[in-house]
Amino acid sequence: MEIEDRTETNLVAIRRTIYLAIQSSLSFEECAHKILKMEFAEKDYGEICAMIIDCCSQQRTYEKFFGLLGGRFCLLKKEFMEHFENLFREQYDAIHRLETNKLRNVAKFFAHLLHSDSLAWSVLSNIIITEDTTTSSSRIFIKIMFQEMAEYMGIAKLNERLKDPTLSPFFEGLFPRDNPKNSRFSINFFTSIGLGGVTDDLREHLKVSTIQLSQKIQAEKLAALNVDSSTSSSSDESSDSSSSSSDSDAKKKKKKKSKTSRQ
């Protein structure tokens, strides 16, 4: 019976092996070939993906080698792609812990996987762009990643992808429509990074919703005025009725008094 060794020592050995394969390779094809030849167990695929990102983040500047390597593994087996999808979420959630240089490299790495369609664009559902759900670090990450994608794809193709109806449910956090404040924040963010064009639909939505909100407020005010007017009218009628009744009673009393005097 084979005993699974998942001790820290074994994990360190695996990482070291992957690290040496990366450092000793002249091309991403050679590196992928070396790692695959080692025949790692499927349970270690996550370590391979994590090491690729870790080595990428350690570079002084982003090296396309790592994006190509990560993309190759994503295309080889869906298990690798799934691990990178999970790592995207983990990296984004902990992005505030990365120093700027590492953050930049990781953002460009994932931008490569996305614009090359090595990674499913559904991972972008992890991003919600509002004032309350972003930090300075996460905004820098999003900025670098989207600018990198725009550079490789072109703004027109990027815009086309972001408007794909089959993917739109995954982009609701990027272009929030839950309230005008969040919509404006997203529009201002993308405009500030030179990608205002991707928010055209959101701008139109904000314009329409603002008009509808204004009309709703006006209708409510008008309804309130009508209620006040109706209440005031009823009050006046009641007052007039009461006054008429009082006058009538007074006349009757006066008439009765006059009749009594004559007798």
Residue spans for each PLM region:
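Hydrophobic alpha-helical bundle architecture
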Residues: E90-T100, R104-T134
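Helix-loop junctions that connect tandem helical modules in alpha-solenoid scaffolds
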Residues: I3, C55-C56, Q91-E99, E131-S136, ...
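Helix-start/N-cap signature of alpha-helical segments
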Residues: A41-Y45, Q58-F66, M81-F84, L98-N105, ...
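Long, low-complexity, highly charged intrinsically disordered regions
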Residues: M1-F65, E82-E85, D240-S248
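Short sequence/structural elements of tandem HEAT/ARM alpha-solenoid repeats
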Residues: L26-I35, G46-M51, K64-L69, E79-L87, ...
